[in-house]
């Protein structure tokens, strides 16, 4: 694994509020190695641990990107949907930022069928084919297209299972995380003080509620992937 300087500074993390955990009564004891202290009933994360693990995660995705690996970013909470799209587009990653369809990965054959249907409908819409259909039939197809785009738009060019998944919230994306675990897909996940770090391959201790925190972490990972892609090996 190639080590690089990703400018993961404590001041930047503090300004982004990455160190703020949940109230002390809402915690998972497995997170104790990553907790620095408590303040006014709130756990404060140890940012030196966050810096170490985020740096390791950046090194990992950089090396994977150099090898031409594919990434999937997942974040479906309202406050992060646009952040997921932004980070994914910057780093040419696939993403899910709306509803996660159960079986998206574990039932990949069905997902491929849905993707083909989505692409067929999208092409038909682009060519104006809906305009030549009866209104009721056109409305049904347009409704299907909207629903499929919401769930599959970010993975429409994903031709196979991803090599690495980046997940922003362990609880919100528990099904996605479980599917990755079943399939042996390595996961990088932000873990707040109420999370179980044992459920992910590379935990990044951090505030998984604040936009500023999630954006800061995603930006670092997206930068590492982008730099890796610019150094991609040609075989």
Curated annotation (Swiss-Prot):
Q: Which InterPro entries match?
A: Ribosomal_uS2, Ribosomal_uS2_bac/mit/plastid, Ribosomal_uS2_flav_dom_sf
- Keywords in UniProt for this one? Chloroplast, Plastid, Ribonucleoprotein, Ribosomal protein
Q: Where in the cell is it found?
A: Plastid, Chloroplast
Endpoints of the signal sequence: none
Extract the GO molecular function terms from the UniProt entry: structural constituent of ribosome
| Gene3D superfamilies, A to Z | Glucose-6-phosphate isomerase like protein, domain 1, Helix hairpin bin
| Gene Ontology cellular component annotations, sorted alphabetically | chloroplast; mitochondrial small ribosomal subunit
Fetch the NCBIfam families from UniProt: rpsB_bact
The record's family statement is: Belongs to the universal ribosomal protein uS2 family.
Q: Indicate what this protein is called per its UniProt record.
A: Small ribosomal subunit protein uS2c
Organism annotation: Adiantum capillus-veneris
